[in-house]
């Protein structure tokens, strides 16, 4: 079983300038996993990317990881 919270945390820490500020909240509702990624305000642009491309890529990778366990994932960035 893939630890989605740790996967998202690792991806985000690799992108941002302040990896210490990265945290992830997880809530599970059946097969649906809701993840909220918190990053420093200065790093928000790096995580979202131009026109949201980085955020979309992160969500795509997380969906692929979740589908391996027949789960659905929702990633919110704050």
Predicted regions and their residues:
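RNA-contacting regions in translation and RNA-metabolism proteins
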Residues: 1-46, 57-78
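An amphipathic, aromatic/His-enriched active-site/gating alpha helix that lines ligand/cofactor pockets
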Residues: 54
């Amino acid at each position: 079983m893939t630890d989605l919270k740790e996967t998202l945390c690792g991806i985000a820490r690799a992108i941002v300038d302040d990896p210490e500020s990265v945290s992830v909240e997880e809530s599970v509702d059946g097969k649906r996993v809701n993840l909220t990624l918190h990053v420093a305000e200065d790093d928000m642009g790096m995580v979202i990317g131009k026109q949201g491309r980085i955020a979309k890529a992160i969500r795509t990778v997380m969906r692929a990881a979740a589908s391996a366990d027949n789960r659905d994932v929702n990633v919110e960035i704050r």
